[in-house]
Curated annotation (Swiss-Prot):
Essential cofactor(s): Mn(2+)
Pfam families the UniProt entry points to: PEPCK_ATP (PF01293)
Binding site for substrate: 45, 179, 185, 305
GO biological process: gluconeogenesis
Name of this chain's protein: Phosphoenolpyruvate carboxykinase (ATP)
Domain of life: Bacteria
Gene: pckA
Residues that hold Mn(2+) according to the record: 185, 204, 241
Amino acid sequence: MTQANNAVYTDISAAQLVEEAIRRGEGELAANGALVVRTGHRTGRSPADRFIVQEPSTEAQIAWGAINRPFPADKFDALWDRVASFNNAQEHFVSHVHVGSAEAHYLPVKMTTATAWQNLFGRQLFINPSAYNPAGKAEWEILNVANFECVPERDGTNSDGCVIINFAAKKVLIAGMRYAGEMKKAMFSVQNFLLPEKDVLPMHCAANIGEEGDVTLFFGLSGTGKTTLSADESRYLIGDDEHGWGEGVVFNIEGGCYAKCIDLSEKNEPVIWKAIQFGTVLENVVLDEQRTPDYSDDSLTQNSRAAYPLEYVEKRSEKNLGGEPNAVIFLTCDLTGVLPPVSILNNEQAAYHFLSGYTALVGSTEMGSGGGIKSTFSTCFGAPFFPRPAGVYAELLIKRINAFGSKVYLVNTGWTGGGYGVGKRFNIPTTRGVIAAIQSGALIGAETEHLPIINLDVPKSVPGVETNLLNPRNTWADKNAYDEAAKGLAKLFIDNFAKFDVSEAIKNAGPQL
């Protein structure tokens, strides 16, 4: 197939995009049919290269700072034109997709990419509607040109790459970035700004539905288990990462999944394993000589990924949405071994732990975080993606929980019996047992034990889970060491929470010294 060197491929199929990616040398086929690509020196998001255009219509509503960095509007216009001109002189790919599955809340997006594989990624992760933009809404544009190199002195960027969101112009500019997760998270940030205006809570969470129509939400940062735990063969998946919660509905913002692949196994993650097939994109996964993926090989990164459409998941919500959640689960990966496998939260505790967003950076998705594992706090369990002040999202969460009567739980997928390096991590079957008990309603009205210092209430028994695991102090050989670790963790919580201006009731719902 011969093409002009500046040919534009518009809305071609996933199979054609795979073919083009191979033809252009962008990737190779794995034995399981997936397209395998490498993203170069950036194998995760680059928070220092993310900006929001500072302009009059939105600047008063954005929480400016290290996460939401301001970018001048005139510099944006100049850089957009420069990148567009560069891209128009080469082959590129255009697809028309939706971001948001609910009719009232979708955004129509024209997605232009310099590479076939990143267009395929967008096609698989966003929503391919049967009819594009039926409501005739104003269109957003993504311009993603991986082979454009920014010049900071000229362009006003931080490095050779950038991600810039312009709300007034409805544009997202991504230049010099081969890691495709930037595109997904940029549009998530856009919806995270827009949805609260409609009284909808945008959430960094996974969601699934039981046979009776009961919905569970799984909040958590990367590596805490959102994708793995929501991919449950006994339930129907809504989505693994980004959702909106409005009156009467939980809807997926996306149309696909972006699963971590490190140490992936068919035994522990059968749903994800089966979804890796022709049309799936594997980022930074190492292949052996027979082109079989070696998911245990982290020589490129711990943050290897699979991007696949929800159609590759057998049990899924056909409409990409469900009702309001019966159970809201905050997943935390506790490195200290202090937190119990499950705690039952009241509304004030829910607000406290939602604002805190405590977890560990495990196989981090961010560049520059290093290979080390460390504790962190990420407001709303996704601080890098929420442009408005945290209180906006916390108030919406409590409003929704109160209105529907959702039950809230804190689930530790991290360490027990000691901290990292001493204790051991909860295995996936144990955590699945906790989740199953929550979803069955077994913990509603359960008899609890109060844990001082960390100020949490734990059930005295959980069906299918060893009772001696429930109070973490019992799992430590040295009880004094546990008490000291608990005080250390409580201090981390208290120091982190000092920045929030909230009621005394919420402040007092957290750990106490």
